[in-house]
Amino acid sequence: MRSIKVLLANDPAILREAVRAVIVRQPDMEVVGEILDPLGVLLAAKATQADVVVLGLRDAEEPGLVSHLLAECPQVTILGLAPHGDTALIVQMRPWRKEIVDPSAANLMRALRQAVREPGSAWHEPPSP
């Protein structure tokens, strides 16, 4: 099975670095690029053939950016992260959107894997202890 290609395009830098640190530990994922300019996300997603684009939550909730990115790269799953790390959102075509209530590293990786491998599926978080 091929690796899930992840493009990091989120701010602040500390959040991007934290996400990168989690992804590089995943045997089935690879970081294929990092971009700081939201205007360059579309070009970078096309150039890297990313499966996942990680954006800041403000960018992921920007209808123009998301709709344009999904129109040009329909295979892409968008992961939007809040800068303070307590909210995450996964967006795909068809339209499909899932808020992750507990955005721990394990839950984010599980959600990304399912979103990429089963596009549009209803992902369920594990029950709280």
Predicted segment positions?
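Internal alpha/beta domain cores that form substrate/cofactor-binding pockets in large enzymes
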Residues: R2-H124
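A conserved mid-domain beta-alpha-beta active-site/ligand-binding segment of alpha/beta enzyme cores
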Residues: P129
